[in-house]
Design a protein with these regions (language model features):
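Hydrophobic ligand-binding cavity/cleft-lining segments
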Residues: 1-43
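Hydrophobic pocket/interface hotspot
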Residues: 20-24, 56, 71, 82, ...
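Short beta-edge strand/loop motif at the mouth of beta-sheet-based domains
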Residues: 27-68
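Tryptophan-centric aromatic hotspots in well-structured domains and transmembrane helices
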Residues: 31-32, 74, 84, 121, ...
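Beta-strand/loop substructures that line and gate deep hydrophobic ligand-binding cavities in soluble
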Residues: 89-140
């Protein structure tokens, strides 16, 4: 299973790399799809704490928190690497890690290419092909999620 290809999606947004990075991180609650939440109660707020070691979690309407992962690399405004600690059963596991790398590359004075790569999918074992299919889905995977980000970045 070590040959499971990463999922890679990208979008070009009409803003600076600095602003794109800020919207992706500090502004995650403005664009993260509400249905992308593994908590028992609906998602009220999505949080990405700045800096290496910062938590990535959702706050449910009932007040409970639901971890997604943590910040592994924080290099504003060009690069962010997050630990995605969601198992194939869509549950948080502190001992399970795949990586999501996000890069912000200027393509002009106010144009930035944002690339998301979700890798280490072989760690899902036999569930890897199905999990990869889910996070690569045009109706719910990383492309869909980046579409939400792009709408906010265009404002």
């Amino acid at each position: 299973m070590s040959s499971v290809a990463p999922v890679r999606r990208e979008v070009v947004v009409s803003t600076t790399a600095e602003r794109a990075f800020r919207i992706f991180t500090d502004g995650i609650d403005r664009w993260w799809p509400r249905e992308h939440h593994i908590g028992q109660s609906p998602l009220q707020r999505e949080v990405l704490e700045p800096g290496v070691g910062g938590r990535w979690f959702g706050v449910s309407q009932d007040g409970t928190t639901c971890d997604v992962g943590k910040v592994l690399v924080w290099e504003p405004p060009h690069r962010l690497v997050l630990a995605w600690q969601i198992t194939s059963e869509w549950k948080y596991d502190a001992d399970f890690v795949t990586e999501v790398e996000v890069t912000f590359t200027p393509e002009g004075p106010k144009t930035t290419r944002v690339v998301v790569e979700h890798r280490d999918l072989h760690r899902y074992g036999l569930a890897a092909p199905e999990y990869r299919k889910a996070i690569d889905s045009p109706t719910g995977g990383w492309g869909y999620i980046l579409g939400h980000f792009a709408k906010i970045a265009a404002e």
